[in-house]
Swiss-Prot record:
Subcellular location: Cell inner membrane
Function in brief: Two distinct, membrane-bound, FAD-containing enzymes are responsible for the catalysis of fumarate and succinate interconversion; fumarate reductase is used in anaerobic growth, and succinate dehydrogenase is used in aerobic growth. Anchors the catalytic components of the fumarate reductase complex to the cell inner membrane, binds quinones.
Gene that encodes the chain: frdD
Lineage: Bacteria, Pseudomonadati, Pseudomonadota, Gammaproteobacteria, Enterobacterales
Family as reported in the entry's similarity comment: Belongs to the FrdD family.
GO molecular function: succinate dehydrogenase activity
Annotated SUPFAM superfamilies: Fumarate reductase respiratory complex transmembrane subunits
CDD domains: QFR_TypeD_subunitD (cd00547)
Keywords, comma-separated and alphabetical: Cell inner membrane, Cell membrane, Membrane, Transmembrane, Transmembrane helix
Membrane topology field: Multi-pass membrane protein
Gene3D superfamilies for the chain: Fumarate reductase/succinate dehydrogenase, transmembrane subunit (1.20.1300.10)
GO cellular component: fumarate reductase complex; plasma membrane
GO BP term, pick one: fumarate metabolic process
This protein's name: Fumarate reductase subunit D
Length: 119
């Protein structure tokens, strides 16, 4: 018999943030690491293109703040979601694990938002 009042799951929201963070970490983050961490220090990228003044101007614009926010928050949600499910897979049952991991991700998201807004 089909339950006429099925319980709604909050898991799709967390899976969505996990998927978005995974895609961001796989596509966008390596490009930024390549540019800022490898090409710029080795002189393979024009230094004035990523000068302090230009980067500061970009990060203080709306699109720059959104980019910086997403660069921090999406991989954060992905990582904490992975940790939550890794604990479950290893049979290490954290009391209220969903609240611990997703709550920490939510708190760090708010902290990041405050930091990016006040930048």
């Amino acid at each position: 018999m089909i339950n006429p009042n099925p319980k709604r799951s909050d898991e799709p929201v967390f899976w969505g943030l996990f998927g978005a963070g995974g895609m961001w970490g796989a596509i966008i983050a390596p490009v930024i690491v390549l540019l800022v961490g490898i090409m710029l220090p080795l002189g393979l990228f024009p230094g004035d293109a990523l000068s302090f003044e230009r980067v500061l101007t970009f990060t203080q614009s709306f699109i720059g703040r959104v980019f910086l926010f997403l660069m921090i928050v999406l991989p954060l949600w992905c990582g904490l979601h992975r940790m939550h499910h890794a604990m479950h897979d290893l049979k290490i049952h954290v009391p209220a694990g969903k609240w611990v991991f997703y709550g920490l991700a939510a708190i760090l998201t708010v902290v990041t938002a405050i930091g990016v807004i006040t930048l």
